[in-house]
Amino acid sequence: SAQGLANYVKSQVPKNVPLACAIAYDTRHRSVQFSRLCAEVMVAAGFKVFYLQGFRSTPELSFAVRAKHCSCGIMVTASHNPPSDNAVKAYWSTGGQLLPPHDQGVIDEVMSVDTINRTDFDQAVAERQIEFCQTEIDREFIAAVGKLATPGPRELKIVYSPLHGVGTTAVCPVLEQAGFTDVEVFALHAKPDGDFPNVPGNVSNPENPRVFDSMVEHARHVDADIAVATDPDCDRIGCSAPLTMAQDSEWDTLSGNQIGALLADHVLETRQQAGSLSAENFIVTTLVTTQLIRRIADSYGVRTIGDLLVGFKWIAGAIDEFGA
């Protein structure tokens, strides 16, 4: 896969433009080894590699591609799939995943690879063809995401679970940057572990309400206001919260559409109150998004770019086309 990506990118980038690739990995089995292998292949193909050493999130990898002006990026992960799986997510220079025609172009190159070239990882580091950039990117990523925080109460007690994934490298520092100081990492899910041992069915999908059973029990015990979880590569979120303000309230795990509707309304409301909502702003929805979000956007006079195919890459494409 790495060789095919390298071959395709080289065919698309002008000869006088330096080649660069950002690489990160999650907590799955052999993710470290696969990321090093990808780095060796990319260096041998003539790319400078910006390598995030240590478990990092998919959003941070996407950020690194743009921050380092890379030609492409590689995230070694299988998202919230079972423990037996691992794979790569490929990113274009925009920081988004591959869109047509590039996605098919890379697949065609992968299928036609007959030779895989590698440069020894340690040798490439010594020759500065691989640069460890995690400290710099961590700082810039956390600051950039923290600036997106909207006004509102910060006196919340949050129980957070990375579901044995990378989330503590992204969620916790971003929450702290945004002013949320009472955050407890749920101990049962805190350890990075590709077996996802303490998650129901060993599948770390925060959209599965069963994931929250033990979290909610603990959250109620410590009188938390909300329980939040992210998948292994930290690009998917779920949450559970009490139905009322009563101390003995039942808790409910929100669906993706419920979370999306609440976030859309909150962001639009706070931007309107700040006087920063304009006709240039828009909401993006996909084929599986509730129509409630379109109605919320309409109520604020904001257009909706809707019914995109499912996947972050299509949303990123809309941002590139219409502006953020």
Stretches found by the model and what they are:
Residues P14-D85, G179-G238:
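N-terminal small/polar loop signature for handling phosphorylated ligands or for N-terminal nucleophile
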Residues S1-C38, V125, E131-L156, V166:
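An N-terminal, well-structured beta->alpha segment
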Residues K15-C21, M42-K48, P151-K157, D223, ...:
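Short, surface-exposed connector motifs at secondary-structure boundaries
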Residues V32-L37, S62-R66, S84-A90, M111, ...:
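Short acidic, glycine/serine/threonine-rich loops at helix termini
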Residues L37-A45, K68-H69, K89-Q97, P173-T181, ...:
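A glycine- and small-aliphatic-rich helix-loop capping segment at beta-alpha/alpha-beta transitions
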Residues I74, S79, N86-I107, I237-E269:
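Glycine-rich phosphate-binding loop of actin/hexokinase-like ATP-binding domains
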